[in-house]
UniProtKB/Swiss-Prot annotation:
Component of the Mediator complex. It comes from Dictyostelium discoideum. Its cofactor is Mg(2+). Disruption phenotype: Cells exhibit slow growth, they do not aggregate upon starvation and form small plaques on bacterial lawns. Disulfide bonds: none annotated. Its main location: nucleus. It is found in: Nucleus. It is an enzyme of class 2 (transferase). InterPro entries: CDK (IPR050108), Kinase-like_dom_sf (IPR011009), Prot_kinase_dom (IPR000719), Protein_kinase_ATP_BS (IPR017441), Ser/Thr_kinase_AS (IPR008271). GO terms for molecular function: ATP binding; cyclin-dependent protein serine/threonine kinase activity; cyclin-dependent protein serine/threonine kinase regulator activity; protein serine kinase activity; protein serine/threonine kinase activity; RNA polymerase II CTD heptapeptide repeat kinase activity. GO terms for biological process: aggregation involved in sorocarp development; G1/S transition of mitotic cell cycle; positive regulation of gene expression; protein phosphorylation; protein stabilization; regulation of aggregation involved in sorocarp development; sorocarp spore cell differentiation. It catalyses: L-seryl-[protein] + ATP = O-phospho-L-seryl-[protein] + ADP + H(+); L-threonyl-[protein] + ATP = O-phospho-L-threonyl-[protein] + ADP + H(+); [DNA-directed RNA polymerase] + ATP = phospho-[DNA-directed RNA polymerase] + ADP + H(+). CDD domains: STKc_CDK8_like (cd07842). This is Probable cyclin-dependent kinase 8.
Amino acid sequence: MNTHNQSSNQNGGGSGGGGGGGGSSTFSPIVLTSTYRLDVQEKYTFSYEIGSGTYGMVYKADDKKRPNNKVAVKKFRSTKEGEGLSLTAYREIGLLKELSNENIVKLLDVCLNPKDKLLYLIFDYAEFDLFGIIKYHRENGSHFSDATIKSLIWQVLNGIHYLHSNWVIHRDLKPSNILVMGEGKECGTVKIGDFGLARIFQSPLKPLNENGVVVTIWYRSPELLLGSKHYTRAVDIWAIGCIFAELITTKPLFPGKEKDPKIPSLFQDDQVEKIIRVLGKPTLDMWPDIKHLPEWKRLSSMEAFPNSLAKCVGIDENSQAYDLLSKMILYDPSKRITASEALDHPYFKELPLPLPNAFSKPIPYPPRLPINKKKREFDD
């Protein structure tokens, strides 16, 4: 695919991010010098809140030095007295300051505000995310064009290939973390965001489960659900496969009901059942290493179902789209397709070809609204 070969080729080299090809697990130290310790409101004019999470809030704002240039400002909640910079914020800054790819969100600025002692990260503003775009189609009873689906998924894979080539696992891929740029020179360009759960991995791999449960449950891979202690880049590929299917149908592929998320040790039986109802029950022939997972014996009490993926997604089993999707959501993570292999899949070589601008003209989607459709001022 001619429009993207250059970016795909550069991803294997590791231009700075993620510790490089040697598998190092550290970044250069983060030093918040006096240049960062400026009143954030002196540099940016805040409009309204556009998102929130356990980390804090995200605001739409204008850069005072660059008129009409929109930015997104991520405001971290205060930590307990004396704790200083949160570990989540530290990790996100450490990763993003060294990663550079057209499909990864760009960190523009860091401010440690002297007034409220809070940390602010400033990014390029993305008008859309896949959560909102999918919701628009679902509520309107419409579907994405084949070209848009292919362009979006290619760009997500391109960004993840870059991360994986630089020893980074995102660990929280879901539609709301896949941003898409609006009008401008990068219109229709995917930007993978929210690196609060991203981690460096090493080769040979070390256990990563000590960081707790990751990945929103609908996009959580079976090895995580069954208690794997040594998960890999394949968890990101599973999540992308779930997003791929959701773009095709505008509905989540595995919408399980989560038990108390505050108790990470809970076995999420409803989520596992949702997967089994679509892919069938995994067997030892299908996934030999499943017998080593802490929760695998729980599967014996679950009902068996035939594989109904093609029917659930509504695509031909003989199509290249189905072939790619089925390889992204294989039970066995060691057999799951890699990001590099996926980018080279025949699906992306048949018409329509993926494009840098995933949107048709004019863009049909409404602009991002304030939370609760009410203006949320910065000082609220």
